[in-house]
């Protein structure tokens, strides 16, 4: 079993396609197929289910990908240990939920100080990003907190108010039973907070409509399609124009924190150490 075989396996699993992996790796398709087959023969088990639309991981393949992610991350960190210099450089793969308002400020400040670092940013939902950090697919992520997890370190970034957003000036709790609620997909911290609030109030929502993009949710609310709950900072540009109206949540449900997480067993490169320093600096500035 060679390291390259594991890299090919991971690429096929990511694309769910032999063709897609071959294109990314600049291999002929038959070569990728042969390497996967050789790997399956060595392990004496099928790693993929083959079907007309491509491939998907078999139960054994799902076990395999967890080990492969860790092995490849360890190799990457081993290389980084010997390449790491006093000047931060290399690649940092960072995930973020869509509504982190302070992210552009943090990234701009970081890039200005450390231009040799290539930052790769990936948007996602909180639960999805947690999983990717745990599997070493991301070096870290900005997510909704708080979080309790034994293998993840977390750093406070900031805390802000959540607000209920409607197209009407007035709102009653009973409106949840008659008006569609516009939310992100399952795994979003704001959605979880909203669902807990409704559960505490004993309210059965009329209907949940799922979206992937924040601006689509907000514009849909402005058009009267439904109501939503998001951080205040994410909607103020529409509120000041009178396109939507913001209503306070109960005090116990009104605040949500943004935290930065990283795997506690991951090698702490100078690039990551400098990012953590930048996050702390901006937190201190916001509290001043």
Swiss-Prot record:
Residues 1-58 form the HTH lysR-type domain. It comes from the Bacteria. Gene3D superfamilies: 3.40.190.290, Winged helix-like DNA-binding domain superfamily/Winged helix DNA-binding domain (1.10.10.10). GO terms for molecular function: DNA-binding transcription factor activity; transcription cis-regulatory region binding. Residues 18-37 bind DNA. Keywords: DNA-binding, Transcription, Transcription regulation. GO terms for biological process: regulation of DNA-templated transcription. InterPro entries: LysR_subst-bd, Tscrpt_reg_HTH_LysR, WH-like_DNA-bd_sf, WH_DNA-bd_sf. PANTHER family: HTH-TYPE TRANSCRIPTIONAL REGULATOR, HTH-TYPE TRANSCRIPTIONAL REGULATOR GLTR. Belongs to the LysR transcriptional regulatory family. This is HTH-type transcriptional regulator CzcR. The lineage of its organism: Bacteria, Bacillati, Bacillota, Bacilli, Bacillales. The gene is czcR.
